From Swiss-Prot:
It comes from the Eukaryota. The lineage of its organism: Eukaryota, Fungi, Dikarya, Ascomycota, Saccharomycotina. NADP(+) 1 binds at residues 15-22, 49, 153. Keywords: Carbohydrate metabolism, Glucose metabolism, NADP, Oxidoreductase. InterPro entries: G6P_DH, G6P_DH_AS, G6P_DH_C, G6P_DH_NAD-bd, NAD(P)-bd_dom_sf. This is Glucose-6-phosphate 1-dehydrogenase. It comes from Kluyveromyces lactis (strain ATCC 8585 / CBS 2359 / DSM 70799 / NBRC 1267 / NRRL Y-1140 / WM37) (Yeast).
Amino acid sequence: MATQFDENTVITIFGASGDLSKKKTFPALFGLYREGYLNPTTKIIGYARSKLSNEDLREKVKPFLKKPNGAKDDAKVNEFLSMVSYHAGPYDSDEGYLELKKIIEEFEAEKKVDEPHRLFYLALPPSIFIDVCSKLKENLYTESGIQRVIVEKPFGHDLQSATELQEKLAPLFSEDELFRIDHYLGKEMVKNLLLMRFGNTFLNAAWNKENIQSVQVVFKEPFGTEGRGGYFDSIGIIRDVMQNHLLQVLTLLTMERPVSFDPESVRDEKVKVLKAFSPIDHDDILIGQYGRSVDGSKPSYLDDETVKEDSKCVTFAAIGFKIANERWDGVPIVMRAGKALNEGKVEIRIQFRRVASGMFTDIPNNELVIRIQPNEAIYLKCNAKTPGLANENQTTELDLTYSERYKNYWIPEAYESLIRDALLGDHSNFVRDDELDVSWKLFTPLLNYLEGPDGPQPKIYPYGCRSPDGLVEFLADHGYTFSKPGSYQWPVTTPKM
């Protein structure tokens, strides 16, 4: 059983002056402290190159430390910030690390810590990642204690770069010490998938090719690159959210039942199903790039001055998948993601096969929708008799909206959940090295095709549209049956973002 980090743990955040730390890491630690899941004896040290004082860092992160409802809690904020300090230093020389080592060891000596517990959070760009890992291992590791290292994506740019990264990391950290964070695995509805699937007989029994007609994993954003064009141009939507976040969701949807919730049992099954994915057919995709909005008020992707004028960067993609195993053989699966669309949401759609005809001439499919964000919810579209004397069908839904059902529950943010898991030593919701390898093997040939000299030109779609032209036909070709116009309206739970 993994050792739980509790009293007198030292958490060091590299890249502490950056946006990720300010908007995600520090607020997540505060959330854990506020709810009683971070021991008040914890010492939190921010480390970066920026010349800041302790007070400078505290003032920088303070506006982002709030309650889940957005309200401030000054007393808790001040208590938390008293646990936070800052040290400036270079990333590429020993000097700053040795100074940091002294600070950590003085704290541990003062607290009479025999077995140090040190958690290092690397909120850093790929360009300096390995240098920092090497210096960290050389200067900040202790033989008498336990170290854990949280690393952020991207975990490589393709299979080759991911393999090279792994080869450099392997001599530095054991797999037990390394926590590759994909924040989607910390989202409440994603963490709910295994319990929902395998803890409910009616769902588990229907979760197969005999009953399921089509599967979709959907990601929509209502905004474009908004100043990140230069960065986004080098990655595109597939690397940004599909090879990592959405694939993690899909593996949890399609994996077999693990023998237990033990981290290795769960990750073993994820790798098994990934290996059963057929290679992506280059003709089984739909790609697009957003243009200006219909009214001209929103810019096109190419209007961004940091983007190459002839860029073929994909900002929307729909990809068909096939899984060659007993459970999923023949079931069409679509993963789709896009920027600059009409709304912001992430959801899973499982459409079931129609019931046999005979007593029913034309009855809609059942459909299970799992809303990951925003406003977590589960809907089951089903058929029922319309109240009254007539024997007519009405399509309705069974509705579990979390904000209504669990009003008095604290639903942790993804980073809160995952940092807590790392403190507990629980790897269940982190990416293992072989899992990363198989995922890149699946996507790299497609990326090479799209980015090669003979790669296709993405279709232009207007900023703010519901979907690019051709998506309805693409989904229909992949087994999805649309409701008749006006026959049913899905519950509206997604505010425009």
